[in-house]
Amino acid sequence: MTHRVINFYAGPAGLPLPALERAQQELLDFAGTGMSVMEVSHRSKEYDAVHEEAIVLTRELMGLPDNYKVLLLQGGAHLSFGMIPLNLLRGGRKADYIVTGNWAEKATKEAKLVAGDNVRVAASTKDEKFARLPKASELKIGEDSAFVHFTSNNTVEGTQWKEFPKTDKPYVCDMSSDIMWRPFDVSQFGLIYAGAQKNLGPSGVTLTIIREDFLEMCEASDLPSYLRYKLHAEKNSLYNTPPTFGIYILRNVLAYNKSIGGLKAIEANNRKKGELLYGCIDRHAGFYKGFVTEKADRSLMNVDFFLPNPELDDTFVKEAKKAGMVGLKGYRDIGGIRVSTYNAVSVQDVETLVGFMDEFARKNG
């Protein structure tokens, strides 16, 4: 077997090995076509089966009601930042954005370029370096708000909404870094979007889930065609040539997720990984210092912490790499260490890291 490292990169991130092995087996002859899936027409029945299976598996794993559409788009969260206000904030509609980190701030900035003062900041923890999430009492949400936008997991800062913001308004949510980490009730969500490259598949696919009443808000015939959610829904995400190989890998990952017990089993693994990693940080509190100030806000997808000095941070990363673990260097604006423990990272992988951390603290503390 080819040598594999333990991948803690924040994105693009590791993928389940069985999903990759399936792609390896089918790479040169997909579905008996004598071609790779990368070479097959997106209008062929062989590709169409993959496309539909990815949509069906998304619906099944997330328990989506019939009044939600699943779209397989491109452009990542960056394009979605603009598409959302272009489609949903027409005719003077207003929205409130909760700013909890680097990506939430970018989403707000892009929305303001489109809708100006109709995009309002409901709360921000920027003054505290986004080291915690806003409390319910800090949220200022207008009665005239069409939706409340938030980022469910803040990849850079390592905070996560395990309980969604308290409001009676519909949610629009960037779930790029924690989609499908657990089951949840989607009924309050008008739109969910997620770049695939952290928890679902390779870069190049943006999974978008939109409720039908929100789709009806998207009367946007004056927009360039690709920017219209309604058109993509009508064409079943085949208006243009889709990222076929990315969707194929997405299908493989979703099929694997189903085979291991779905989102309930995935949640159990994610919670166990969090217990192990945060347990180690708290056990060595004089050596490892977490970035997040409120324990309830700690992310189970991205864990940020610091060692006593930057030199030790660098040594930690280098020695971990020698031990077969990569992707641990912290985000450039924060520094320290960042461990990304997305769905594809196993409990055993985290146990290996925690063993390394215990020994590193013993030797250097």
Can you annotate each of these PLM segments?
Residues 1-41:
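N-terminal "arm"/small-domain region of PLP-dependent enzymes with the aminotransferase-like
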Residues 288-319:
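Conserved PLP-binding catalytic core of the aspartate aminotransferase-like
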Residues 32-80, 87, 102, 110:
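Conserved N-terminal alpha-helix of the aminotransferase class I/II PLP-enzyme fold
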Residues 78-146:
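PLP-dependent aminotransferase-like
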Residues 16, 196-278, 294, 365:
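Active-site C-terminal subdomain of aminotransferase-like
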